[in-house]
Amino acid sequence: MGKGAREKLLIFYYICSMDLKNLFSSITRSLSGGKLNLNNLAGKVESKLQSKAKTFTFQALPADLAALKALPEAALTDPYATAALSLLALGQFQDNKAASVEMLDFLKGPDKCSPSELQLISDRFMDGKFYKVRSFFEGATPANNYTPSQPYTVKVSSTPYSFDNENWATLYLHSGGSDSPRPVKLRKKPSTGQWFLVEIQYLGDIRTPVAEDKWA
């Protein structure tokens, strides 16, 4: 396929995936010297159609806020890192809820965890389902009762639509007990360039670990 045909095809896909307001804004920004700059617009299209994934490795799970802040990811300038840290913060929810909430509050930045948010998290862990957190670390599966490999590794991914809204992101964590990645919402604070946690949406039910599965 020639370069010109490729650009036109990409632009066609872009148009199909946008509403009219966003399309008009993109075309306006792509005008150069009174002519439509196809290279710029095609570049945006290609970027939009790509997905991305990052992995983060931790030697140990932080026991408290001080330990969390000591991690390089705690600069919070990378939304993928903030998403990964949200999982680490939940790692203490069973044994030290106060420390877990303190870490979550740090990740939420200008906001704090509301009583309703904390209740929702508690509900997700009902009946001892704290294995949900472990399931997101590499190597954890129902067959090994969600025992993570060491060191702890977390994969965070995006879709072509994860950053559609300016200063907002929906990223995804991958559980060994689910066929589909689970979302987490984040928001950027432009004045600091940091990405903060907005909503944890990845704690839905997953496959039962073998030790608790009466049908295993």
Language model features by range: what are they?
Residues 9:
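Cationic, low-complexity basic patches in intrinsically disordered or flexible, solvent-exposed regions
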Residues 17, 88-95, 174-178:
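Short, flexible beta-strand-to-coil junctions
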Residues 118-177:
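Surface-exposed, charged secondary-structure patches
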Residues 47-138:
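Core segments of small alpha/beta cavity-forming domains
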Residues 13-14:
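Short, positively charged and aromatic/hydrophobic N-terminal segments
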Residues 18-56:
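Glycine- and small hydrophobic-rich membrane-insertion segments that are intrinsically disordered
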